[in-house]
């Protein structure tokens, strides 16, 4: 996923298919002022070398375990995944609008895993990690003798998962069990947080991640979705690094 920012504003995004290699054709035309290459996994050194050919300011790399500017209460800040850091730092840096609706926010990133991160008055408190939709559906296939696999192309066509929660076929039951389970998990966490922060304000929810649009959270309010939240957080981290290096 490639995000482009101009004068601090998000202007464009390019999505790569799973397994698709990054190439110069995915990048904006001409030279850019700087590049941030970030992620929790490893990548070939040739990627950074390729990006340097299009960047006036070189390439900054951030990997899992690297120091980061997020203000957090977790015991081991370096153990946080880079996407979780970016999501929370987007809020700390006020990279998104609408945060005035609450002092307490739960960020829900629905991808390979479902991560939640709680930010209160700009401080990251921690969160949770659980299996994502594909992982849940595949686990039912791999862990049983009779349940079938369901390809992502099939269950995404049934999205969003609203209304009827009863599957009429085994395939529907698997999909609804996985999807409704995630929705119920998120709603349940939201209710627990509202009890925990009952002396503050109603907890807000920000949805992001590739599968976030497939869920139905019903009565959860305030809530909004930002599919580019992680990119905005990475940009905020990049700006912080650039500013710190110029001091």
Predicted regions and their residues:
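N-terminal glycine/serine-rich phosphate-binding loop of ATP-dependent small-molecule kinases
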Residues: 1-68, 201
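Short glycine-rich, Thr/Ser-proximal phosphate-binding strand/loop in the N-terminal lobe
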Residues: 1-31, 123-146, 160, 164
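Gly/Thr-rich phosphate-binding beta-strand-loop-beta motif of the actin/hexokinase/Hsp70
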Residues: 1-11, 91, 101-124, 140, ...
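Adenine-nucleotide phosphate-binding core of ATP-dependent small-molecule kinases
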Residues: 14, 159-203, 222-223
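Glycine-rich phosphate-binding loops at beta-strand->alpha-helix junctions
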Residues: 37-46, 197, 201-222
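Glycine/small-residue-rich loop that forms an oxyanion/phosphate-binding "nest" at active or ligand-binding sites
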Residues: 51-93
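Conserved phosphate-binding/catalytic loops in two-lobed NTP-binding clefts
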Residues: 56-70, 219-235, 243-247
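Glycine-rich phosphate-binding loop plus the immediately following alpha-helix
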Residues: 86-101, 125-175, 237-243
């Amino acid at each position: 996923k490639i995000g482009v920012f101009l004068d601090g504003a998000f202007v464009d995004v390019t999505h790569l298919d799973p397994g698709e290699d990054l190439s110069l054709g995915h990048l904006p035309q001409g030279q850019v002022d700087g590049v941030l290459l970030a992620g929790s996994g490893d990548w070939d050194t040739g990627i950074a070398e390729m990006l340097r050919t299009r960047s006036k300011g070189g390439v900054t790399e951030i990997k899992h375990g690297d120091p980061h500017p997020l203000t957090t209460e977790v015991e081991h800040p370096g153990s946080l995944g880079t996407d979780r850091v970016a999501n929370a730092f987007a809020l700390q840096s006020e990279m998104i609008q609408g945060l005035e609706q609450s002092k307490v926010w739960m960020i829900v990133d629905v991808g390979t895993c479902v991560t939640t991160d709680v930010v209160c008055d700009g401080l990251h408190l921690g969160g949770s990690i659980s299996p994502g939709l594909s992982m849940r559906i595949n686990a039912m296939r791999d862990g049983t003798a009779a349940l079938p696999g369901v390809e992502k192309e099939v269950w995404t066509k049934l999205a969003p998962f609203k209304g009827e929660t009863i599957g009429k076929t085994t395939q529907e039951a698997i999909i609804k069990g996985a999807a409704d389970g995630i929705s119920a998990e998120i709603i349940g966490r939201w209710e627990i947080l509202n009890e925990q922060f009952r002396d503050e304000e109603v907890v807000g929810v920000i949805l992001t991640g590739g599968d976030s649009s497939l869920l139905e959270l019903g009565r959860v309010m305030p809530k909004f979705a930002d599919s580019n939240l992680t990119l905005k957080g990475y940009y905020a981290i990049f700006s912080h690094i650039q500013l710190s290096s110029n001091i």
